[in-house]
Amino acid sequence: MDIALGCDNYSCAETQNIFLAMRMLCLLPAVTDPEPGPVNAAYALKAATLVGARAVGLSDKIGALKPGMAADLMILDLKEPAFVPFNSAARQIVFSEAGRAVDTVLVGGRPVVRNGKLATVDEAALAAEAEELAPAFRRDAQALTVRNAELITPLLNANREAWKVSLGFDRYIGRRPS
């Protein structure tokens, strides 16, 4: 069974990106089995491209660079430290890169990142607006924290009770079977 990777959401972490998703795919099996397995850097790249496209029913449109496909691609600057000296595209992309080397991104052939900067958004204006809104955001977040404090104990208790129910498998990654 193939594993598809994607990272087009913010519910996991504001810093999530496809490079970190590929790295985690390679590293997580190591916490459950000390023996090398089938998940390596080349497979992680496949999971993030071809398998990801297939999983969402778009393998005829995206996931590969060939005629007739959408021109969705990322160009990396190989002069960045993650790629010096260059020796393995797959290993260096998966285990060394975190996004710093992204120079250009094309979506449907249209540039959305140029020279490492967003081409579709005024980054300076966005940063200024975020700074302007930050005090109100912090105030609202603090008010929510205070308001929700009374919910913490009942929610934790409900969660603990739910975890007592057997699902027929161990929920914890890394715990060796006894």
What is the predicted function of each stretch?
Residues 21-24, 51, 101, 107-108, ...:
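Generic recognition of well-ordered alpha-helical segments
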Residues 70-127:
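C-terminal cap of metal-dependent C-N hydrolases
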Residues 36, 121-123, 142:
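Short, glycine- and charge-enriched coil/turn segments that flank and shape catalytic ligand pockets
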Residues 1-83, 95-98:
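His/Asp/Glu-enriched, well-ordered alpha-helical/loop segment
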Residues 43, 47, 51, 125, ...:
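A non-catalytic, amphipathic alpha-helix used as a structural packing/dimerization or gating element
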Residues 26-29, 137, 141:
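Conserved NTP-handling cores and scaffolds of large molecular machines
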Residues 62, 140-148:
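Flexible, glycine/charged-enriched surface loops at secondary-structure junctions
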Residues 124-128, 132, 145-178:
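C-terminal regulatory/interaction regions
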